[in-house]
Amino acid sequence: MFIPKKTKYKKDFKGRISGNAKGGYTLSFGSYGLKALEPCRLTSKQIESARRSISRTLKRVGKVWIRAFCHTSVSKKPMDVRMGKGKGSVEMWVCKVKPGKILFEISGVSLNLAREALNKAQAKLPMKCKFVSDEL
């Protein structure tokens, strides 16, 4: 899935997602895209689920780019474990998404098919998104 091969540190701080995206807010590769409208932590499973729904809708036509990658680890302690005794083990990997970030891009398909595919992908994501196009 979408996890890094190697990291400098195994566990990250939780942190906050503040402000708007400083980069990655314009279409770079495709003609159509899905833009985040609110801050969120996207898991690698959610990104993979959205990617699958896009590829099923497009049916091997066009090209898809995924512009979000999971760099941050999230740790969790097991059930019925008391507080303390160190930080828990890594549970999942997440991508911290700021408002304005382009998540997916599509090219080589019609406007209607791209809108349908990205709307299905949007339903898999836990935040509000907007369909963007370089034509509009």
Curated annotation (Swiss-Prot):
It comes from the Bacteria. GO terms for biological process: translation. Part of the 50S ribosomal subunit. Pfam families: Ribosomal_L16. Signal peptide: none annotated. Keywords: Ribonucleoprotein, Ribosomal protein, RNA-binding, rRNA-binding, tRNA-binding. Belongs to the universal ribosomal protein uL16 family. The gene is rplP. This is Large ribosomal subunit protein uL16. Binds 23S rRNA and is also seen to make contacts with the A and possibly P site tRNAs. GO terms for cellular component: cytosolic large ribosomal subunit. One of its GO terms (molecular function) is tRNA binding.
